[in-house]
Amino acid sequence: MDRRLVSALILIVAAIISISLYITLMPRQTQAARVVVYAYNDRVTGIDPSIEDDTGLVVLGLVYEPLLYYNPVKNEFKPALAVNWSSNEDGTEWVFHLRRGVKFHDGTPFNATAVKISVERARDIYRETGRGLGYIWDAVEEVQVVDEYTVRFKLSYPQRLDIIAAASYAAYIFSPSALVKSGASSPMDRALEEWFNTGNEAGTGPYMITYYRPDSEIRLRKFNEWWGWSIVNNPDAPDEVVIRIVTEPQSQYNGLIAGEIDVASSVPRDNIADLVKKGFKVFNLTTFHNYIMFFNVKRYPTNITEFRKAILHMINLDEAVALAMKGYAVKGSGVVPHGFPGHVDGLSYRYDKEEALKYLNESGVRTPVSIEILYQVDYEELKIFAEYLQSRLREIGVNLILKPQPWSQLKDTAKGVWENPESTPHIIIADWWPTIPSPYDYLYSMFHSDSKEWNFAGFEDPEFDELIDSAFEVEGSNYTHALLLYKDAQEKLFNEAIAVNLWDEIKPFIYSGRIEIPEEAMNPLYMYVISFQYVKVKT
């Protein structure tokens, strides 16, 4: 062979080898992580999966999973950690068959023991301390581990345990390894609660906590071994979710405009049309999130029924809702919101100044008189409503003193109605969203004499307690009768003017064009939770 040809071939081979080595050894360009920033409007109050009963849901709903999910609007169940379930004829025994191959975030396997420990802990903490929302498991007498992937529940009275197993609180399953990591001697040991609430977690959900500052920011990272990725089939899901605490609505608006926020939960409603013009999108979620105005029934003069009715007849609720909510709410009726099981129409007071003056005269309260109203400081709609009510009551000689407070302080102040009612404001406005799709959730949590965490009226009435307890106990066997009992309970609250539902919120979530939020990412039972595993991030 010609030497020149050989030399040329050698050079070509050398060049190919060099190029191959360069391609092999050169730094690989990695795809930028998909990061979504979600602006949430309240500090996170806790992330203990058994006990948390407030704003921590926004985190719990992504990090943990229940046995089932339920959408009350569609009346539809979706399997989560359980794949199928059944009950005996009278609803006193339920069997759940669990999903196989599921891992907790620390790599330990999910099994029936985890379900037993999680359910019993939520139930027993509530039974012993009244904390959390573990009352939902009240009927559960025994949780039996049949085998690694089968759990049997034995109940003391019939219940729709499928609905309870899909609750937004007190139904999340955590890994038993958390007991070892926290140094807890038992599931009831406070050391476990402290471990959770310092930013640790033990869930199976699609995202894991990597950074936890409940007053400012929580960061979540995609859990690549989540069992559901093959079902969701969304390669464009966020790799990281940043939940940023932004309490001021105007700051959420500014963050969207600056490109610092991708999803905002609470921009000023007056600015929504402007944001749409700028290319932002809106997901309007019809919710079961309502705003309750409680009267402190343990303090003069709101301990007088006629005085409470005088105040209520000075509210033109249609006018007030339009003013405060800018079209993003439905006027309340009864305590249970529209579209929710047990809602009752016609339980709202009409504006009638003559009627108000009549009741004021019957109350024996001399005017001028001053009373206080407590509401959350960073909710613009409540400020607007409080100022509206202040103006109206001035017409009948009632001076309304405004007492806005941050949520954590407000809650502590409101609970004072039980220990120190004379120092607790006469009127308290607080919001509520459901734990389970039952009227009992609203009526028990906010008005039962045993529920002192959320009963801001200080209302105690054995007849009322008996009505709703009886209703809950027959829900699983005679649902029609249960609804009638719940209706009677709501009428009692209305007739005695203990509290009123001001409005049921339509929640606008504003988001940038770089993401897509499909319908399956939002479920009104799990308020403020965006299921980011369904969200698509454009790159």
Give the ranges of each region predicted by the language model:
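N-terminal lobe/hinge region of extracytoplasmic solute-binding protein
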Residues: A39-E89, E120, A202
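A structural "hinge/loop" feature
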Residues: N41-L60, L81, T108, D162-F174, ...
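Gly/Pro-rich hinge or "lid" segments in bacterial periplasmic/extracellular proteins
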Residues: N71-P72, E76, S168-D236, E240, ...
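Aromatic- and charge-enriched surface segment that lines or borders ligand/interaction sites
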Residues: V83-T129, V146, R152-K154, P301-N303
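Surface-exposed binding/hinge segments that line
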Residues: H97, G134-A184, R213, R514
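Structural transition elements
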Residues: Y207, T302, V330-S363, V377-I384, ...
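Detector for C-terminal structural segments
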Residues: R213, E217-I218, K222, L312-V344, ...
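Ligand-site clamp/hinge motif
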Residues: W226-A273, N399
